[in-house]
Amino acid sequence: MSAMPDHWIKEKALKEGMISPFVDHKEEAGVLSYGLSSYGYDARVDSKFKIFANTHSSIVDPKNFPQDSFIDKETDVCIMPPNSFMLAKTVEYFRIPKDVIVICVGKSTYARCGIVVSVTPLEPGWEGYVTLEFSNTAPLPVKVYAFEGACQFIFLAGNERCSISYDQVNGKYMRQGGVTLPIVS
């Protein structure tokens, strides 16, 4: 497997719609950077956030997820409480080629403030908006800026195509249009 360079990412985005909307350069003036980088793509976070709130003393069960465990906020600046967790989605829609798997890493600017951004791999053949998981490990509130960079996606090309891709197994998170809560089917 090899990490794919900027020119490969740009070609796939423009010719095959791998990333849409696609920013073909690194935008960084006065914002948390986003767009194309040397060996990845820095994606933006949308303005709709779901912040965990223990208002009902619920237990989080991934098989029976309590929908009322979140407070929904739509804002350009979301203030994450200390030691909290929230979900959001990318501004960009991704279409992953069948010979590629994508991993996500956080941005150093947020990491230095105590924010960890986590995403499970984007499987070959998957498409949709990516649900982002934010953890505030800091003992203080931290601002998260909508429409600015939140994480970097690294595209790893396999030596050959996989036998069964995510779209072929009707994956439960295929074509998700917004923040998607856990699904156990």
UniProtKB/Swiss-Prot annotation:
Any one GO MF annotation of this record: dCTP deaminase activity
Enzyme class: hydrolase
GO process annotations (BP): dUMP biosynthetic process; dUTP biosynthetic process
Residues that, per the record, bind dCTP: K107, S108, T109, Y110, A111, R112, T131, L132, E133, Q152, Y166, Q176
Database matches in InterPro entries: dCTP_deaminase (IPR011962), dUTPase-like_sf (IPR036157), dUTPase_trimeric (IPR033704)
SUPFAM superfamilies attached to this UniProt entry: dUTPase-like
Entry keyword set: Hydrolase, Nucleotide metabolism, Nucleotide-binding
Catalysed reactions, as listed in the record: dCTP + H2O + H(+) = dUTP + NH4(+)
EC number annotated for this UniProt entry: 3.5.4.13
Active site residues of this protein: E133 (proton donor/acceptor)
Keyword Transcription set for record: no
Pathway of action: Pyrimidine metabolism; dUMP biosynthesis; dUMP from dCTP (dUTP route): step 1/2
Similarity comment text for this entry: Belongs to the dCTP deaminase family.
Quaternary context: Homotrimer.
Role summary: Catalyzes the deamination of dCTP to dUTP.
PANTHER family found in the cross-reference section: DCTP DEAMINASE
Record protein name field: dCTP deaminase
Native species: Anaplasma marginale (strain Florida)
Gene: dcd
